[in-house]
Every structure is written in C-alpha cells, then in structure tokens.
Amino acid sequence: MPRIVTRGIKKEDVKELSTVLLDTIETIIDRPKSAFTLEAVEATSYFDGEEAPLVYVEVSWKARPTEVCKEVAEAITPLIKDKGYEKVFVYFKELDLEKEFTL
C-alpha cells in the first residue's frame, strides 16, 4: 500500500499528474496502482522571509532496495519539474506493515 504525499504542489497539478505519476510507480514496483493513495497537501516553504518554491514528495511503503527508491525518484522528478517546479525532494519512509491496522 504505497502512500504518496506531495507538499508544495498545487492540488490541480497533482490531479493532472495523478495518472502518469501512479502509472510510472506501478510499472517500476510491479504493484497495481489501485493499492496506492495519493494526497496533495498544500504548503508553502519559506527562507529568509521569502517564499521558497520547494516541492516534497514523501513515499511511504514497505522496505524496498535503495536502487528501486532511486529509480522511482528519478522517474517522477521530471514529471513534476515539467509542471514548472524547480526543486523537487523525494524521500521514502518504510512502513512496518505489522503495525498497520484497518479497523
């Protein structure tokens, strides 16, 4: 159940990117995109009293090799940059599925 959370991207852009973004990750990790969630958190970063146009993409999923994480980051970054965002930070969090519950 990969969970992708974006920050610093307009929700309209996330909506437009959603199909290609999830299709890309689906292909790389060989998991159906129906198992993914994609969220857009509207946020603004600041540096020295000015807005800093930074984008963060957090991918939470079960442990995967660093090479797979790098491949995903390298595949999705240009998709986001094509929307006009210059700095994109992609990071990964490992979920402990034994401690995840749906009640």
Each model region followed by its residue ranges:
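Interaction-mediating elements
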Residues: 1-103
